[in-house]
Amino acid sequence: MSKPWGGIGAWADEAERADEEQAAEATATAADSQSFPSLKEAATAKSSKKKKKMTLSEFTKGAYTAPSSAGLTREQMLQLPTGPRQRSEDEMQPGRLGGGFSSYGGGRSSGPPGRMSRDREDSDGSWGGGGGGRRSYGGFDDDQRGSNSRVSDFPQVSRADEDDDWGKGKKSLPSFDQGRQGSRYGGGGGSFGGGGGGGAGSYGGGGAGAGSGGGGGFSKADEVDNWAAGKAKSSTFGSGFRESGPEPDRWARGVLPSGGGVQEERRRLVFEPRKADTEVSETPTAVKTSKPSPFGAARPREQVLAEKGLDWKKLDSDIEAKKGQTSRPSSAQSSRPSSAQSNRSESSALNNVENVVKPRPKVNPFGDAKPREVLLEEQGKDWRKIDSELEHRRVDRPETEGERMLKEEIEELRKKLEKEAAIAPESKESQQESDSNHQNLPDLIREKEKNLDLLIRELDDKVRFRPRAVERPGSSASRGGSYSERPHSRAGSIDESRSVESMERPRSHGTGDNWPRPVDDRRNFQGSKERGFFNNRNFDRSSSAREGW
């Protein structure tokens, strides 16, 4: 009977067997991860110093290793499709959506087979129109569900590949009225999601399918270049609100015919020409007279002169000639009447013309005022003498001995002339002598007065235009020359350190003393401060020299 825990040493055999299995697994994993070793192995592995040798051609060309491509197995090859998938009858319906969209929008309405036929005579040309059109979005109006679906046109060839020149097969544009018969692109009423076969082209109309099967025939989209001309107004969603039809491009009276008849256009309105323009053109004077003229009854000067038989050009030339001889005409003397005179009547205009011929006298802006010289001459006074006396009064100076003597002589001659005129002549001889003396005295008086005036003018000019020495604050050389009238002080005295800028005081009458007076105390103070250091130094130097001597 075998023991349940096995024989002696069985655990050792199991341990060895487990070690062998682990070693086999380790070798297998090492072989797999040889190209990509782990970080630990890469860190522990030591690269040999001796590198592998290779030729230059092997280095340049490189060793080509073909990509290892694992092919498909037999089972996978058998599972691959060998043809198109077999479709059911529902999927083969014309308007059926494929893929995950097969159940979108509910059922489809029944219609003829074919994919979006080019010929849409019996069906609506817009989306979801009557007669087999596409169902409305989301499956509205589920009561009219049909089996209309798309046609599977996979084996068909595209017409774009058949024709190289697409413009050859393009039809000529139809007339505007033909394209309007019935509904646009073969439809009649209808709206989004609306029912009713043969409904007009609005989005989502229910009814029959959207196109006939097959690929033959031209589309009306190719016949019309301007699609916006027949565009219908977008209607509301759902079947609750419906429209009677598309909005027409031209207005028409009455109800539109539903049987596709030709619409009658409204007649053009023929307007008669406006009568107001003709009346205005025929009677322009009546319109002008309605507004009062700002110039009143005044007329141009040329017309007035022409009525009087005068040549206005000749009058203007005469006036200009007269003005050129006298002086430059002012603005008040212009040949044409001013704007202020234009509102007068014809008589006033003629008077103005006559007045214009005679130049107006110039008005003196000063009135009756006359110059001072003219008035003094009329009064018998000499204005030059008066001016000289006034100028002499402005100069403040004492009277000299020469002036006093000339004045006394003039006074004596005047008294003598008055006495001779007062005493009547007793004899003819005395009368002749008095006449000669009487003629000589006025000449002497005039000569004396002339000499006195010249003397006074010279003395006044000397006082007024006397040169004044301008002393600089730091110049000591000009100081001594400018104060020639000042009494000299002793050499080395303290007065040399004081500099007072002064000018000659005007002498009063009867006194000839000249007293200096300061001009600018502030300037004197600054000058004394500036020169104080140097003057004190010179003073110390002179005092030390005295002590040394």
Swiss-Prot record:
It is found in: Nucleus. Residues 1-446, 465-549 are annotated as: Disordered. Residues 24-46, 327-349 have a biased composition (Low complexity). Keywords: Initiation factor, Nucleus, Phosphoprotein, Protein biosynthesis. One of its GO terms (cellular component) is nucleus. Residues 281-292 have a biased composition (Polar residues). A motif (Nuclear localization signal 1) lies at residues 169-176. InterPro entries: EIF-4B_pln (IPR010433). Over-expression in sns-D leads to programmed cell death (PCD) in the leaves characterized by spontaneous necrotic spots on the rosette leaves under aseptic conditions. Embryo lethal when homozygote. Belongs to the eIF-4 subunit B family. Promotes the eIF4F and eIF4A RNA-dependent ATP-hydrolysis activity with different efficiency depending on mRNAs, thus providing mRNA discrimination during initiation of translation. Homodimer. Nonspherical monomer. mRNA-discriminating component of initiation complexes. This is Eukaryotic translation initiation factor 4B2.
